[in-house]
Amino acid sequence: MEKVTAIVLAAGQGKRMKSSVSKQYMLLKDKPVLYYSLKAFENSLVTDIIVVVGNDEISYVKEEIIKPYGFRKVTHVVEGGSERYLSVLNGLNKIKDSDYVLVHDGARPLIKTNTINTVISEVEEKKACIVGVASKDTVKISTHDGIIDSTPDRNQVYTIQTPQAFEYSILREAYDNLASYQGAMITDDAMIVECLNRYPIYLVQGEYTNIKITTPEDLIFAEAILREHQDFI
């Protein structure tokens, strides 16, 4: 059986939440936000989980989240970096023998186990795939001065989520070439793989409920979704 490792990122500062508590540790229906994504991966076909956390949070996550909720697939809890991609790199450096890697934002608590399993099935066939949903809005491209430059075809515009999945060797190669991407605004793992310009990345249909907790309003939305969909709990 092929080994699939999930890297769950929980090192974000969450400055837009206007709270002293990191967003991934805020309570959502009496449980930490991070609990929900870890539960989804624990129940999935993933073999093991690496959790990447902020400075001085390793002990807290182990004692207050992983042990109490019995997340047995978590093999490592490591400290993150100053940027998202550096946190992923720290997680990658703990992997010894995986065939595939899924990277997920811990601030996306409403990821479904079925979606994770679909991504695993797709990446085993296609080597690189990311979860996304079709844009509901018209998207405009603007200049730095705020002037509208163009309007892409909405049928080709997707809002990208996580998890993002890759054959381990591909993601490792991409991160080994990080030095050549200096100056690039790297916002997800697909961008780093895109820079290799050798591997097609396929879309996997996601769920509009797979929101990222970024602002206080997002917690309200997530709670409303949980009330309607008990399978997340």
Curated annotation (Swiss-Prot):
Keyword Nucleotidyltransferase: yes
Similarity annotation: Belongs to the IspD/TarI cytidylyltransferase family. IspD subfamily.
Entry EC number(s): 2.7.7.60
Protein's name according to its UniProt entry: 2-C-methyl-D-erythritol 4-phosphate cytidylyltransferase
Species in which this protein is naturally found: Lachnoclostridium phytofermentans (strain ATCC 700394 / DSM 18823 / ISDg)
Recorded catalytic activity of this chain's protein: 2-C-methyl-D-erythritol 4-phosphate + CTP + H(+) = 4-CDP-2-C-methyl-D-erythritol + diphosphate
Gene3D superfamilies tied to this protein: Spore Coat Polysaccharide Biosynthesis Protein SpsA, Chain A
Pathway(s) this gene product operates in, as recorded in its UniProt entry: Isoprenoid biosynthesis; isopentenyl diphosphate biosynthesis via DXP pathway; isopentenyl diphosphate from 1-deoxy-D-xylulose 5-phosphate: step 2/6
Site (Positions MEP for the nucleophilic attack): 154, 212
